[in-house]
């Protein structure tokens, strides 16, 4: 899977360069993240760029995977992630609950993805196969790839957050500004639709 080589943020003359090959990936058990962001969020709110870089390293892969799965373009995914991180870096001082960092930055990402998707629909020119290379997604199952492609953009976003990154229905609801019961119901319908399509019934 293609990844962004780096994301560079400029803010009041400070520069953060976070390279993808040195990322410290956050692991989770049962969909519950085990990292406590509190200390670094407090430092980042005070202008500590190194603390923000550490926060970035813990969420980058989640951000990129969700953006790529939703937008189906590595270039656009990198752009959306870069915009998300820039916004987060410049507004982290407004984040009151340190433990809410992950959900907060995912909300920013969700808004950026939706904006990019609106740009797609506004553009009447169709994208070529070269602009959407299937190998970026690493789908071994062609039928699954095609079934996911037929989902609407919001369904792909919800599915990616659940299946790829392990977010719970409540977490997805909070990030996307939806009702938790609606998210769980929609996830169930999405999975059932994929199951039926793949089984040929």
How would you name each of these model-derived features?
Residues 35, 41-65:
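A short, charge-rich alpha-helical start-of-domain segment used by transcription regulators
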Residues 93-97, 106-126:
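Arg/Lys-rich amphipathic alpha helix in sigma70-family domain 2
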Residues 158-162:
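A short pre-motif secondary-structure segment
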């Amino acid at each position: 899977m293609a990844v962004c080589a780096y994301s560079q943020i400029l803010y009041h003359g400070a520069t953060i360069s976070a390279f993808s090959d040195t990322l410290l990936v956050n692991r989770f058990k049962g969909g519950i993240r085990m990292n406590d962001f509190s200390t670094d969020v407090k430092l980042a709110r005070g202008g500590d760029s190194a603390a923000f870089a550490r926060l970035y390293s813990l969420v980058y892969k989640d951000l990129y995977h969700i953006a790529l799965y939703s937008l189906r373009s590595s270039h656009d995914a990198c752009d959306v992630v870069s915009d998300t991180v820039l916004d987060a870096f410049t507004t982290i001082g407004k984040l009151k609950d340190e433990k809410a960092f992950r959900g907060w930055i995912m909300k920013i990402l969700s808004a950026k993805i939706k904006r990019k998707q609106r740009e797609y629909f506004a553009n009447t020119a169709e994208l070529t196969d070269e602009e959407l290379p299937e190998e970026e997604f690493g789908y071994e199952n062609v039928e699954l790839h095609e079934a996911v492609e037929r989902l609407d953009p919001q369904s792909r976003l919800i599915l990616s957050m659940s299946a790829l990154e392990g977010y719970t229905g409540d977490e997805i609801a909070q990030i996307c500004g939806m009702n938790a019961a609606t998210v769980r119901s929609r996830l169930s319908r999405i999975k059932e639709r994929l199951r039926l399509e793949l089984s040929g019934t």
